[in-house]
């Protein structure tokens, strides 16, 4: 009985729509474009944003038509089913739509090529359904609904995720997007706080709060190494402006930043010939006497006796093209150099 009702409902969706042939023709056009252009074949022409313009136009038409028809056709569930069919036709596309107030927001992942993926916002313009704006960044887009701004304007968070490394680290950009009349604009972005790149291990967006666990930059930080310091920051909405305020949270493996700060002071003292500072870092005068002024840090991972709470750590260095090993030992909250010497071949 239920299956029969579902079939009747499906038939109604096809026959009751004012121009039922439209979506079928549009889907066929989409399939033809996907086959003919061989997108993602690695050529510069096949990976450019312009190559996807016609495909985006078809998807925009599909969504705008459904929103204009209204009723069940304008529901998130119906639109998602239709867009899933387009995604299956292309194979490489993934489209997710979410309702944000009176807006319909879509996250379109069409390719791994830079600048191709987009977030597209649909709503009413002059009383008609329309595409209001698009955002395009590098990475895979994910849309999270957000509480309205103090004045009631609709908002959402757009996350742009890069590909994960073998260690589970990925580039991330977060944008808070707010409706302003018939337009939308980014009112806050993580790129303002992290202009180079925000490399995260994990993040979450829920209940008016964003948590981000990432690798901060500091002297001695070496990308790709285990056991380095990670920070967890919390972003919450400011009551007055509705934009996000950063609140520092906990640190993981804080010992590595402290160790590397000690190592940096050691290298600086050697380069400057600062014997007083050197004596505070190296208690043994014989070890101090062996250290060359040309000693510099080497871009290699540290060797610690524990990744979470080490007592001794070996740090790689170099002097006049000769590799050195520096052994630091923790005494309370301080790190001191207790052994040093060239690495024999």
Where are these regions (language model features)?
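Short beta-strand elements that form the blades of beta-propeller/WD-repeat-like
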Residues: 102-111, 153-164, 208-219
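Surface-exposed beta-loop interaction hotspot
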Residues: 138-156, 251-258, 262
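Repeat-based blade/solenoid architectures
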Residues: 77-90, 135-146, 193-200, 257-258
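Terminal domain-start segments
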Residues: 16-126, 130-135, 275-276
